[in-house]
Amino acid sequence: MTKANHHIFADGELSRKEGTLRIDTLEGETKYLPVESIDALYLHGQISFNTRALGLLNKHGVPVHIFGWKDYYRGSYLPKRSQLSGNTVVEQVRAYDNTERRLRIGHRIIEASIHNMRANLQYYSGRRGDFDSVVETLRELKTAVSDTQRIDELRAVEGDARKRYYDCFDSILEAPFRLAKREYNPPSNETNALISFLNGMVYTSCVSAIRKTALDPTVGFVHEPGERRFTLSLDIADIFKPILADRLVFRLVNRKQITTDDFETELAGCLLTEQGRLTVLEEFERSLDQTVQHPRLKRKVSFKTLIQTDVYSLKKHLLTGEPYHATEKWW
Amino acid sequence: MQVIVVYDVPAKRTRIYRKLLRRRLEHLQYSVFFGELTAGQVTAMKNEIESELEPTDSIVVFEFDNPHAFDHTTFGDADEPGSRFT
């Protein structure tokens, strides 16, 4: 069992009290959080905190992910690294710098990503429409991945797969939800808003998982390392988005847990309301807790642990050359 | 595993246990704590309780290994135990 995340929606003050976390909300409520039983803290409201609170979080290795206006991801406060290994970072950068090695890792990541997209379509094929031809195309694209010789070529294959995948969304989703076209900054309609929000949550889950290893989150393999971005998190998130985000979008919409009332349209964009975000997060947390039997570990693991094992596998691959098992849906 | 801890100790000594329990568990009611802990956390907690113990103190720790064999109902102003949202 992994520890649970905690989300704070209230506005108020976060402080340290008697060796644990204390929240005083503006409504005058006081609550204590068990700092030793929290995996990661998500701040969604207006919250002030001081260095003593950060020091406590640091001591217990709890990362804080901060969301600003309308729950746009603003950044993370990450505890001091518990895992330090120059060796790992050197190997990671070497692998990145070696075209051959980088490409091989990139292949695994994109193959897994396409595989997971295909698994989603396969599930809904026959239920919500006929996607057999797209499933077949994705199967071909997955095989085409290992033939690519350059990273931009690889990204082109991935983009192609993703486009075909998103094209099926309109048939899977119950009316009035429509994707039409994947757009963000700002999301143009309800479905886009929902996908963007959940992708952000998957991304932060990957940031937390990578932080538990000595890997450098800024050096990714498929995404080009740049400034101010955790490109390795983006790589890992690509594998898990179909499993954790997209599948949840379909479920929330088709079971009518989310309706158009949970969104507000402002200026050019469309975003989730606070109540909507709460509903989505409750379900997201539930899916992180869901377990599946792991063939190599021979025990049940939660989806949250699955992200962790994926990252461990990558690290093992970088250090020892053991094959990297990017998570491909097997259940 | 799911854990419930209740204590009945002299008023002056409550803060000792409150402090060590709050770090790991949700403070549900005055002397009732609930949460999900790992086996290691439970052992550490029990050891810590034991080191603070005096003859006047009474503490009971309940543990449930199977989350499916565990249910709860709340009445009145109670907070939902195990909620991940504030």
Curated annotation (Swiss-Prot), chain A:
CDD domains: Cas1_I-B. Its cofactor is Mg(2+); Mn(2+). InterPro entries: CRISPR-assoc_Cas1, CRISPR-assoc_Cas1_C, CRISPR-assoc_Cas1_HMARI/TNEAP, CRISPR-assoc_Cas1_N. The keyword Secreted does not apply. One of its GO terms (molecular function) is DNA binding. Signal peptide: none annotated. The gene is cas1. Keywords: Antiviral defense, DNA-binding, Endonuclease, Hydrolase, Magnesium, Manganese, Metal-binding, Nuclease, Plasmid. Mn(2+) binds at E158, H223, D238. Its EC number is 3.1.-.-. Disruption phenotype: Loss of the 8 Cas genes in this locus (cas1, cas2, cas3, cas4, cas5, cas6, cas7 and cas8b) leads to loss of CRISPR interference against plasmid targeted by this CRISPR locus, i.e. plasmid is not destroyed by CRISPR. This is CRISPR-associated endonuclease Cas1. The keyword Amino-acid biosynthesis does not apply. One of its GO terms (biological process) is defense response to virus.
Curated annotation (Swiss-Prot), chain B:
Its EC number is 3.1.-.-. It holds the Pfam family CRISPR_Cas2. Keywords: Antiviral defense, Endonuclease, Hydrolase, Magnesium, Metal-binding, Nuclease, Plasmid. Mg(2+) binds at D8. CDD domains: Cas2_I_II_III. One of its GO terms (biological process) is maintenance of CRISPR repeat elements. Its cofactor is Mg(2+). The keyword Glycoprotein does not apply. SUPFAM superfamilies: TTP0101/SSO1404-like (SSF143430). One of its GO terms (molecular function) is metal ion binding. Disruption phenotype: Loss of the 8 Cas genes in this locus (cas1, cas2, cas3, cas4, cas5, cas6, cas7 and cas8b) leads to loss of CRISPR interference against plasmid targeted by this CRISPR locus, i.e. plasmid is not destroyed by CRISPR. InterPro entries: CRISPR_associated_Cas2 (IPR021127), Virulence_VapD/CRISPR_Cas2 (IPR019199). It is an enzyme of class 3 (hydrolase). HAMAP family: Cas2 (MF_01471). CRISPR (clustered regularly interspaced short palindromic repeat), is an adaptive immune system that provides protection against mobile genetic elements (viruses, transposable elements and conjugative plasmids). CRISPR clusters contain sequences complementary to antecedent mobile elements and target invading nucleic acids. CRISPR clusters are transcribed and processed into CRISPR RNA (crRNA). Functions as a ssRNA-specific endoribonuclease. Involved in the integration of spacer DNA into the CRISPR cassette. Plasmid targeted by CRISPR locus P1 transform wild-type cells very poorly. PANTHER family: CRISPR-ASSOCIATED ENDORIBONUCLEASE CAS2, CRISPR-ASSOCIATED ENDORIBONUCLEASE CAS2 3. Belongs to the CRISPR-associated endoribonuclease Cas2 protein family. There are 3 CRISPR RNA loci in this organism and a single cas gene locus. A CRISPR-Cas type I-B system. Homodimer, forms a heterotetramer with a Cas1 homodimer. This is CRISPR-associated endoribonuclease Cas2.
